[in-house]
Amino acid sequence: MNIDLGLFISFFGIFFFYSLILYFAAPRKTITLKEIYISILAGIASISVLQFTYAFLPNQVTYNEFNEFMYVVAPREELSKFIMFLLVTTWISKKRKIKPVGYMIISCAVALGFALEENMHYYLKYGEHVLSVRNVSAMPAHMFFGGIIGYWYAVGKLNIGKFGGRINLGQWFVKSRLTIYSTIGLFCASLMHGIWNYSLSFYSKMINAIMDSIPKVMALPVFNNGWLPITLFAVFILLFLMRILYRDLIRLEKEKQDYIKE
C-alpha cells in the first residue's frame, strides 16, 4: 500500500500542529487533549448541520459574490459551528466547570475541525495544491472566527458583580445576557468571515492580474498564486487580534477570582 507522505503531512500535519498549539498555549487545567479532539470531531460533524441549513433554508438572497459571502456562506457556517460548540460545552460542563478561556479554545477547536473537513472538500474538487494555501489561510482564519464566538460566550458567562455589566445590554437584560452576548459573537464572527472571504476573492484576482503582467519576476512557484501575500498578511492580523481576546479572557478570569475572594 503506497502512501503519499507529502499529501498526508499537508493534510494532517498542519492540522495536528494547530491542535497542539491550542493545547499547549492554554493555561493549566483549562482543557485536555481529549476534549480538544472531541471538539474537532464535533467541528467535522458541523458540516452535516451546514448541509441541513441549505436543505431546509434555501438561499433567498439575490446572487452576487458579496451577498453570497456576507449573507449566505458566512452566517450559515458560523451558526453550524456554534451549534456543535454548544453541544460540546454542554457535554464537558456535565463533568466539570469550564474556565472562560476554555470556551474560546473549544470554539477554536470546533472551527479547526470544520476547516479540516472543508479542506477535504476542496482537495477532492481542486487537487492537492490547494492544501498548502488553505493550511496557512482557511484553518487559522476559521479558528479566529470561532475564537470570536467563544470569547463573547465566555464573557456572557462572567456574570458576577461588575462582570454582569461588561456592556450596557448585560445590565438591562440580565436573564438573557448569555443569549445576547452569543448573538453578538455570532454577528461579529459572521461579519469578519464574510469580509475575509470577499476580500481574498477580490484582491487575489487583482494580484493574479498583476502577476500575469510580470511573468519573469513572478515565475517562481511561491508567487504563482495571488492568495499568498494577502493571506499571510491577513492571518498575521487575525492572530494578533486573537491574542488580544485570549489575554483579555485570562485577565477577566483573574479579576473575577480576586472579586470572589473579596
Which residues fall in each region the model found?
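Hydrophobic alpha-helical segments at protein termini of multi-pass membrane proteins
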Residues: 1-262
